[in-house]
Design a protein with these regions (language model features):
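Short, flexible loop segments at the rims of nucleotide/cofactor-binding pockets, characterized by
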Residues: 58, 180-182
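Hydrophobic/aromatic beta-strand patches that form the interior of the parallel beta-sheet core
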Residues: 105, 155, 178, 202-206
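Active-site beta-strand-loop-beta-strand hairpin of nuclease catalytic cores
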Residues: 169-177
Length: 219
């Protein structure tokens, strides 16, 4: 309430420590080391260009069967969100998901920033110094809001290696693509490609631009 960044940083630090203590207290003993490795790897996983989760980056040689229990524990504790890929945006989305391809985000964008060791002051003073990661923080923020609004399931869409839309949600009668832009530059070839191919009734783009509706694209 008093806009004290250092106080907010201390609170986030305490929350992260509490979560990590919970790993040791409540998780199955065999999964505790995996939980720590997995948790710490999420900021690095998101730093890659396509951000798809790779088991081998948690621990060299690790496979899905080695980490799946730990992943599910973090999900059931509501600490992370697993967003799976779809290639065909049709209802029901769950019928077209590729469960082997997914991204992991944290339940809270402030915790992601803290876990990624991005100083809070840099966001206000020098945001260009982490221009690329700023996009991941924006995605995590938007996802957080979608989850709060009880949209489920939430996926992301790709067309091979050619195009990718950040989020795809299932509305009552439609599938809605969502693009997230952290700045004023809102050029989005992937969203354009998606809209040309599937002709959704509505598409959403979150950016720093003012609110507007342009040919079915709500910014």
């Amino acid at each position: 309430s008093n806009h004290d960044l250092s106080q907010a940083e201390n609170i986030l630090e305490d929350i992260l420590k509490t979560y990590e203590l919970d790993f040791s207290k409540h998780a199955p003993v065999r999964d505790i080391p995996k939980l720590f490795l997995l948790w710490k790897s999420i900021p690095q996983q998101l730093a890659r260009e396509n951000a798809r989760f790779i088991y081998g980056e948690v621990k060299s040689g690790a496979r899905a069967k080695d980490l799946e229990d730990a992943l599910r524990w973090l999900e059931s504790a509501s600490l992370i969100h697993r967003i799976t890929r779809i290639e065909k945006p049709e209802i029901p989305l769950s019928a077209y998901e590729d469960r082997k391809s997914f991204k992991l985000y944290l339940a809270d964008v402030g915790l992601l920033r803290k876990l990624a060791e991005i100083p809070a002051a840099s966001i206000l003073v020098n945001p260009d110094i982490f221009r690329e990661y700023r996009g991941r923080l924006a995605e995590n923020f938007v996802l957080q809001q979608l989850v709060t609004m009880r949209f489920s399931p939430i996926h992301y869409w790709t067309s091979g290696n050619l195009a990718e839309v950040d989020f795809v949600i299932q509305d009552s009668v439609d599938v809605v693509p969502i693009e997230v832009k952290s700045g004023l530059n809102v050029k989005a070839k992937s969203l354009k490609s998606y809209r040309e191919k599937y002709r959704p009734k509505q598409a959403l783009r979150f950016s720093m631009q003012n609110l507007k509706l342009d040919d079915g694209l709500l910014n």
